From Swiss-Prot:
Tissue: Characteristic constituent of osteoclasts and some mononuclear preosteoclasts. Preferentially expressed in skeletal tissues.
Protein name: Tartrate-resistant acid phosphatase type 5
Cofactor note: Binds 2 iron ions per subunit.
InterPro entries found in the cross-reference section: Acid_PPase, Calcineurin-like_PHP_ApaH, Metallo-depent_PP-like, Metallophosphoesterase_PAP
Function: May play a role in the process of bone resorption. The osteoclastic trap acts on nucleotide tri- and diphosphates with higher affinity, compared with other substrates.
Catalysed reaction equations from the record: a phosphate monoester + H2O = an alcohol + phosphate
Annotated PANTHER family: TARTRATE-RESISTANT ACID PHOSPHATASE TYPE 5
Source species taxonomy: Eukaryota, Metazoa, Chordata, Craniata, Vertebrata
GO cellular component: extracellular space; lysosome
Pfam families: Metallophos
Cofactor section: Fe cation
Molecular-function GO term, any one: ferric iron binding
Location (main, coarse): other
Amino acid sequence: MDTWMVLLGLQILLLPLLAHCTAPASTLRFVAVGDWGGVPNAPFHTAREMANAKEIARTVQIMGADFIMSLGDNFYFTGVHDANDKRFQETFEDVFSDRALRNIPWYVLAGNHDHLGNVSAQIAYSKISKRWNFPSPYYRLRFKVPRSNITVAIFMLDTVMLCGNSDDFVSQQPEMPRDLGVARTQLSWLKKQLAAAKEDYVLVAGHYPIWSIAEHGPTRCLVKNLRPLLAAYGVTAYLCGHDHNLQYLQDENGVGYVLSGAGNFMDPSVRHQRKVPNGYLRFHYGSEDSLGGFTYVEIGSKEMSITYVEASGKSLFKTSLPRRPRP
């Protein structure tokens, strides 16, 4: 039987007892899910989104989580109109409504479909929902691993502002940013932040992938402009969505590439397999029969573990990345 399922089963049985005697967690834990944004017509969600929400809630209840990271495409297909758009309720609040999720904060970034609507409205919704945290198009988060001096920095990016939007049906690649000055400002901000980052783990997150074997493939703009920064400043991992599957890649510098775009759709395409350097791909899952999935990340004193979880509850793949060496 799958190890993840056995662990979850045992913890379910022991949960009433453990609730009274479990020591405080000594790891930072979060779920990363992308491309979960339902549909623009009733019931405004899909079976896959509902299945993911249910399994995320079960995972959070049993394993614990400090937050949920949204990797963009939060509302299909054209984002939201304003901060009072009913899609916030119908695609987010009413779907991720389990008791286990009610007090878990979400940290949000925008995807290409969000940019077809009003991203400022998604930012403004942060003042309406106690769970929804989207302070600006790009921003920095800092966490401390409980019961330790281990620190984690996360840089949430707007890759559409960096590279431009893309039409999923016409062009697979963003051609150029709408405002080159805004793109340069964001990249300059990130470079300065990474240069100054002293944390034990440094993560960067955006919607577009740097590397992907799937339908959209590597994002040339990010391979050119973002990838060199990850290597130069010893970034632990880059997290993304956009392609509707689950992938893990790792480059020769040890940077992990966590693609988690299976929150609402599944696409089996591997059309760009030859566009990714040999040896990078460690895991890919895009079965059309699957209900999708997400990643569960746990950061401790020595390593960061990443588990790819199918919405059925099955563990698909697990890997780990080491803590950055201290100066």
